[in-house]
A protein has these predicted regions:
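Class I SAM-dependent methyltransferase SAM/SAH-binding core
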Residues: 64-109
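Class I SAM-dependent methyltransferase Rossmann-like catalytic core
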Residues: 16, 21-40
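Conserved class I S-adenosyl-L-methionine
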Residues: 54-63
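Conserved catalytic/acceptor-binding region of the Class I
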Residues: 148-210
Length: 288
């Protein structure tokens, strides 16, 4: 195991003022540990469909390492994480210890061998990319997967598929202003299309409410102690409180339009046909 516990490793952007730091790292400063748009339940469902035990797993941009801990607990054959941020990489290395390998690198150019992984996992990172970068990262995931391997993603979605384009543009602008990241969430149809354009076959799709700052979600994901920690940190720090409230107002304004969405797709064998996808029960994750 690492000599340093995760709490002793600085958060990414820790030297940047709260007023200008990316929203997800602001929430991490507040003490939030589950930063995925659909919550821990949607992540758990995604990992279950990815079939981790005995697999060689690669995780792209693992962030705080919360999902990394769940992956290594599932007893994969191997675990490799790729993160461009040295502080994030250090935190994940502290989480997985000798149960995995963490490398600093780019999600679109991992440096890994062709067909070296059974599963590639990525959460809440494609949303932050433009169209070309999204496609490049998905292509890289497809490259490192073995035939039959699974690509599992958990991202921010918008609904419905035929959302008004002008309204969608305003949603994106307001979201970018609130979180200080040029986030580009997509419809379920667009997320499916992104994976299919890389030659992958979508097997499973599920959604959950985007309730990142709702008390019920925090109690479920963080536990009573974690939720209390977040509330205390926010209440005692004026700048932190202002940023969190700004994000909360935007999330509330668009709560009917945004969802957490998870998909699992596989890389087909050469010459294999496609199979119909499996949708989650009534399109939502249990307990989300």
């Amino acid at each position: 195991m690492s000599e340093k516990p995760p709490s002793d490793v600085p958060l990414p952007y820790a030297d940047r003022p709260v007023a200008t730091a990316p929203g997800h790292w602001v929430l991490a400063r507040a003490g939030k540990r589950v930063l995925r748009p659909g919550g821990a339940a949607l992540t758990a469902a995604m990992l279950d469909h990815a079939r981790l035990p005995g697999s060689d797993v690669v995780e792209l941009a693992p962030g705080l390492g919360r999902t990394a801990a769940e992956i290594v607990a599932a007893r994969p054959a191997s675990y490799t994480a790729i993160d461009r941020d040295p502080q994030a990489a250090a935190r994940v290395a502290a989480v997985v210890g000798d149960r995995g390998v963490v490398r600093q690198g780019e999600a679109a150019d991992t440096g890994l061998d062709d067909a070296c992984a059974d599963v590639v996992v990525g959460e809440a990172m494609l949303t932050m990319q433009g169209d070309k970068s999204k496609a490049a990262i998905v292509a890289e995931a497809a490259r490192v997967l073995r035939p039959g391997g699974r690509y599992a993603i958990h991202e921010l979605g918008v609904a419905p598929d035929d959302i008004d384009e002008e309204y969608y543009t305003q949603l994106r602008r307001d979201l970018a202003r609130a979180i200080h990241v040029n986030a580009r969430p997509m419809t379920a149809a667009a997320w499916r299309g992104l994976l299919e354009d890389a030659g992958l076959v979508v097997d499973w799709v599920d959604t959950a409410p985007m309730a990142l700052l709702k008390m019920s979600r925090n109690l479920r994901d963080e536990g009573p102690g974690g939720a209390a920690r977040i509330m205390w940190n926010v209440m005692r720090d004026k700048a932190l409180r202002a940023r969190v409230m700004e994000m909360r107002r935007t999330f509330t304004r668009y709560e009917k339009d945004m969802v957490g969405i998870a998909l699992v797709a596989h890389k087909p064998e050469a010459g294999a046909g496609t199979a119909p996808e499996e949708a989650g029960a009534e399109g939502s994750s249990p307990g989300a």
